[in-house]
Amino acid sequence: MASPDWGYDDKNGPEQWSKLYPIANGNNQSPVDIKTSETKHDTSLKPISVSYNPATAKEIINVGHSFHVNFEDNDNRSVLKGGPFSDSYRLFQFHFHWGSTNEHGSEHTVDGVKYSAELHIAHWNSAKYSNLAEAASKADGLAVIGVLMKVGEANPKLQKVLDALQAIKTKGKRAPFTNFDPSTLLPSSLDFWTYPGSLTHPPLYESVTWIICKESISVSSEQLAQFRSLLSNVEGDNAVPMQHNNRPTQPLKGRTVRASF
């Protein structure tokens, strides 16, 4: 399998992405630092509503720079509504970002504070587009819920995901991952910040409406170590653990971050 043209090392990492993906220097890039004193409370924001059918969970895949849990997205059994959205957005995936130590790893930060990891639950606009490929590059095409993860107590709700990692140790491996509702990973409060942004790795499309939960969830040091023990190499090659896969924060460039609270 050819190595991708981007990654998280010095030679192909975030500082280099703009050479192949000029949008990396665009005006709506993610992640960002959320400066709470500069956010705007918006009374028009509705509560976030998620309805995920566990039967849509499909498989878990080691993609070399991370792992993805993918969902069947051929109908509206699993959707996100409310918040800033007038359309319904269909669940297709969740994944995580983490760092080489517990001191950093999240992509978004709050008042400069870095968290240990970040969960992304990704959806596409099924009201306007016919599939993910069509929606992925459109300004209103994607909606991603970001949940900051704070090191502390072990999070039992992560256990099914962590147990599945054994089967996908190396790049390209995939395994069935069924009967799972990712809303179980959300914090108890769904207060959120929202802003227009981008995918946080290539192709970096500026097509994401971000929903960042105000409340974090817990993850233990041991659980984070399990993320880092995944390998970015194909089976049989020298072991290269996935130490980190988080992009640094990008300038807001005049964007407003709205708060639901």
Swiss-Prot record:
**Which residues constitute the catalytic centre?**
65 (proton donor/acceptor)
Description of how activity is regulated: Inhibited by acetazolamide.
Q: Return the annotated region ranges for Disordered.
A: 1-40, 241-261
Q: Which CDD domains match?
A: alpha_CA_I_II_III_XIII (cd03119)
* Enzyme Commission numbers on file: 4.2.1.1, 4.2.1.69
Major location (coarse) = cytoplasm
Sites where the protein binds substrate: 200-201
Q: Using the chain's own numbering, where are the disulfide bonds? A: none
Q: Where in the cell is it found?
A: Cytoplasm
User: Which Pfam families does the record match to this protein?
Assistant: Carb_anhydrase
**All copies of domain Alpha-carbonic anhydrase, residue ranges:** 4-261
The yes or no answer to whether the keyword Lyase is present is: yes
Give me the reactions it catalyses.
hydrogencarbonate + H(+) = CO2 + H2O; urea = cyanamide + H2O
Keyword Kinase part of the UniProt annotation: no
Cite the binding residues for Zn(2+).
95, 97, 120
Q: Which GO terms describe its molecular function?
A: carbonate dehydratase activity; cyanamide hydratase activity; zinc ion binding
List residues, modification N-acetylalanine.
2
- GO CC aspect terms: cytoplasm
Q: What does this protein do?
A: Catalyzes the reversible hydration of carbon dioxide. Can hydrate cyanamide to urea.
Task: Give the family from UniProt.
Answer: Belongs to the alpha-carbonic anhydrase family.
Q: What is this protein called?
A: Carbonic anhydrase 1
Species: Pan troglodytes (Chimpanzee)
The gene behind this protein is CA1
